[in-house]
């Protein structure tokens, strides 16, 4: 043993096998230091190399060995301690203790859930206008139920996307299961959904209602009832949800709780005697919310003994698990190994794992009727398109006896853009990234597209301009991909003289002015019913903005002494043209906007093209109203001129509405001074050289192509 310890290579590579002959040392006679630890501190170098940086370090380690042997000789063999075994034991116990809390947590949650009957389940969501405090209230509820540990770092716990934390808004409806011990001493299983507040993500809110029996209608105590508050109330009311009014931010100096309660009674005819007054920031009054939920929200209806009937609510992609499904069980149970059948696709799957969001994924042995949880299959879904939201799953063999649940209404895109990779070599990787995002956001429509200027790409449909912007941010943050996106445009409907209809979402497909059929066709554009809430002193300016946007006023109501609700019928194209930004600017940020589809209206529309040396740039074309042609045409040519480099010949940039040129800019060519070498020659020689240069430029312009870098398109299309 002594010889082995004296070898440098053994010191540098300590033996990890415990010595069976050496028994455990009593605490009173253990060494003051660990031989193994000392050996591990030596450099890990091969025996053929210099293992020590200096002679001093070598002498120091030799002294350590000498002290070790002295201590060992002073002990009897029955008292010797194996030096490596405790190290291994500590290492293994550390790994076990890091895993055991998670396993114990899952087992403890499973036991508590198994003891809760369906009558003590409550599924509810939080709905409100944007920035009224939904995510902050969710954090306080998670702390109150012990789902997460209380602390200052709990901010937007359920907002898991980078774009949500960056912008401070909720984009995806997020779910969480909570176990709450009520005042009667009984456990209740609560399922919470934190929904988005912006109108562009209303499809998320609508899907969330399918898994809930009630909702917290949250209102800011200083802002009062606003546009999305009204819209979300009527959505929840139409779904038959039980509503619990909650007034938030009561700790603010500008809070006016009596005014807000009066608004709730006047606008929604709600009984405000049961309203809960809270401050989600400080936690004041949060403890009264869950008892109100238990008292006012009914338990879900279901039977765990019946065959499985499961609704697909949401889906996302995981690198290791594949397609993960968020499901709501109406009947039956679901566990690992079960075989399920999809009504939408007819495919059969084997369940690989089930679990709940607590708030992160916690595996469970079984999901029961009334619960909301996640599931993924093993083997997984072959195609992302197989995960159809609103699909019903049941046990294999029960598809003939189980009636599928009504699915979701497909959201209709309001805004269309063309998207192209900045580098065509990245097309394949970008296609996979977009497919993964579309799996998680089913309100996006996707079609392949091609542009002569920008190459292969896609035609994407969104619910609004913010929806489009968030999608672009998610693509960059989650997948590291950047794309060129054209200006948002709304669809156009063409009814030919024969009565046939054509919906055009790509301006490149709009008929040319040479097509004789377009002269006798009727054109329609989409309209929306917009609801604007604003303070009374800004009414005049907002009416002017809506009138300039070709809006038609429907009503003007005072729902308090100082707050006004304006209802307008507006073209959807005005929303793309930053109508909301204009309203916010005119009201110092107090205006709020909500809208819903109002169908088609006849309009005078024309295709606006950007021409470079009389050749159309298809990626920039738009279908606009005739009243906007002059303004947009002038903006286009002025902006595009800034980003196109000078050429050896003259470049003419024009905006054309049909056959009519509405604006023009010219980029002068580089000019060579052909007269520099003539000095004092006669005028005829000078004129001859100038005419020769002019003829050469004319030939170059006839055969030359304008080279436009893709960065020019990127800068032109950016706001």
Curated annotation (Swiss-Prot):
The keyword Lipid biosynthesis does not apply. Residues 119-301 form the tr-type G domain. It comes from the Eukaryota. InterPro entries: EF-4, EFG_III/V, EFG_V-like, EFTu-like_2, G_TR_CS, LepA_C_sf, LepA_CTD, LepA_IV. Coiled coil: none annotated. Its EC number is 3.6.5.-. The keyword Phosphoprotein does not apply. One of its GO terms (cellular component) is mitochondrion. Keywords: GTP-binding, Hydrolase, Membrane, Mitochondrion, Mitochondrion inner membrane, Nucleotide-binding, Protein biosynthesis, Transit peptide. GTP binds at residues 128-135, 194-198, 248-251. It is found in: Mitochondrion inner membrane. One of its GO terms (biological process) is translation. It catalyses: GTP + H2O = GDP + phosphate + H(+). Residues 1-75 form a transit peptide. GO terms for molecular function: GTP binding; GTPase activity; mitochondrial ribosome binding. SUPFAM superfamilies: EF-G C-terminal domain-like, P-loop containing nucleoside triphosphate hydrolases. It is a peripheral membrane protein. Belongs to the TRAFAC class translation factor GTPase superfamily. Classic translation factor GTPase family. LepA subfamily. PANTHER family: TRANSLATION FACTOR GUF1, MITOCHONDRIAL (PTHR43512:SF7), TRANSLATION FACTOR GUF1-RELATED (PTHR43512). Promotes mitochondrial protein synthesis. May act as a fidelity factor of the translation reaction, by catalyzing a one-codon backward translocation of tRNAs on improperly translocated ribosomes. Binds to mitochondrial ribosomes in a GTP-dependent manner. This is Translation factor guf1, mitochondrial. It comes from Neurospora crassa (strain ATCC 24698 / 74-OR23-1A / CBS 708.71 / DSM 1257 / FGSC 987).
């Amino acid at each position: 043993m002594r010889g082995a310890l004296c070898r440098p290579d053994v010191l540098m590579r300590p033996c990890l096998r415990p010595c069976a002959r050496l028994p455990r040392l009593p605490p009173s006679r253990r060494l003051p230091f660990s031989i193994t630890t000392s050996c591990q501190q030596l450099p890990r170098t091969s025996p053929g190399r210099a293992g020590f940086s200096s002679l001093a370090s070598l002498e120091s380690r030799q002294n350590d060995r000498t002290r070790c042997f002295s201590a060992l000789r002073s002990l009897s063999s029955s008292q010797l301690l194996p030096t490596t075994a405790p190290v291994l034991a500590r290492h293994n116990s550390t790994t076990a203790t890091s895993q055991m809390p998670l396993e114990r947590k899952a087992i403890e949650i499973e036991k508590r859930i198994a003891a809760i009957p369906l009558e003590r389940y409550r599924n509810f969501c939080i709905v409100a206008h944007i920035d009224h405090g939904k995510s902050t209230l969710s954090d306080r509820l998670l702390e109150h139920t012990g789902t997460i540990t209380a602390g200052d770092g709990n901010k937007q716990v359920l907002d898991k996307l980078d774009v949500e934390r960056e912008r401070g808004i909720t984009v995806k409806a997020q779910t969480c299961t909570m176990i709450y011990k009520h005042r009667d001493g009984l456990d209740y299983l609560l399922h919470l959904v934190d929904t988005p507040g912006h109108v562009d993500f209303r499809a998320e809110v609508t899907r969330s209602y399918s898994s809930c029996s009630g909702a917290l209608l949250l209102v800011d105590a200083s802002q009062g009832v606003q546009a999305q508050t009204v819209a979300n109330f009527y959505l929840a009311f139409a779904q038959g949800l039980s509503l619990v009014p909650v007034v938030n931010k009561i700790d603010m100096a500008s809070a006016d709780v009596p005014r807000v309660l009066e608004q709730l009674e006047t606008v929604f005819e709600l009984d405000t005697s049961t309203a809960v007054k809270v401050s989600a920031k400080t936690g004041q009054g949060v403890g009264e919310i869950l008892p109100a939920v238990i008292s006012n929200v009914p338990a879900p209806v279901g039977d765990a003994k019946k065959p499985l009937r499961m609704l697909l609510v949401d889906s996302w992609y995981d690198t290791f698990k594949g397609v993960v499904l968020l499901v709501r069980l109406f009947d039956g149970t679901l566990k690992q190994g079960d075989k399920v059948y999809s009504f939408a696709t007819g495919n059969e799957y084997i369940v690989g794992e089930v679990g709940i969001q607590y708030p992160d994924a916690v595996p469970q042995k079984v999901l029961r009727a009334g619960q909301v949880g996640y599931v993924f299959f093993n083997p997984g879904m072959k195609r992302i398109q197989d995960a159809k939201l609103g699909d019903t799953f049941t046990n294999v063999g029960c598809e003939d006896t189980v009636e599928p649940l009504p699915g979701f209404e497909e959201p209709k895109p309001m805004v269309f853009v063309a998207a192209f990779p900045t580098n065509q070599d990245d097309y394949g990787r970008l296609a996979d990234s977009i497919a993964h995002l579309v799996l998680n956001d089913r309100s996006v429509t996707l079609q392949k597209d091609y542009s002569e200027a920008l190459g292969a790409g896609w035609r994407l449909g969104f619910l609004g301009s913010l929806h489009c912007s968030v999608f672009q941010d998610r693509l960059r943050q989650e997948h590291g991909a950047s794309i060129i996106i054209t200006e948002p445009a709304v669809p156009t409907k063409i009814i030919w003289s024969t009565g046939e209809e054509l919906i055009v979402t790509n301006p490149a497909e709009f008929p040319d002015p040479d097509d004789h059929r377009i002269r006798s066709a009727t054109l329609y554009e989409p309209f929306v019913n917009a609801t604007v809430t604003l303070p009374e002193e800004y009414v005049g300016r907002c009416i002017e903005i809506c009138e300039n946007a070709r809006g038609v006023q429907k009503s003007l109501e005072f729902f308090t002494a100082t707050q006004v609700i304006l209802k307008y019928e507006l073209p959807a194209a005005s929303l793309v043209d930053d109508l909301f930004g204009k309203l916010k600017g005119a009201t110092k940020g107090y205006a709020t906007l909500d809208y819903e589809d109002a169908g088609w209206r006849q309009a005078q529309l024309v295709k606006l093209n950007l021409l470079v040396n009389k050749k159309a740039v298809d990626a920039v074309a738009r279908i606009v109203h005739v009243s906007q042609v002059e303004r947009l045409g002038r903006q286009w040519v002025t902006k595009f001129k800034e980003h196109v480099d000078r050429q050896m010949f003259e470049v003419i940039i024009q905006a054309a509405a049909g056959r009519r040129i509405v604006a023009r800019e010219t980029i002068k060519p580089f000019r060579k001074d052909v007269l520099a070498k003539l000095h004092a020659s006669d005028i005829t020689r000078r004129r001859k050289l100038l005419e020769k240069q002019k003829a050469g430029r004319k030939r170059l312009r006839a055969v030359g192509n304008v080279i436009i870098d893709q960065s020019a398109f990127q800068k032109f299309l950016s706001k």
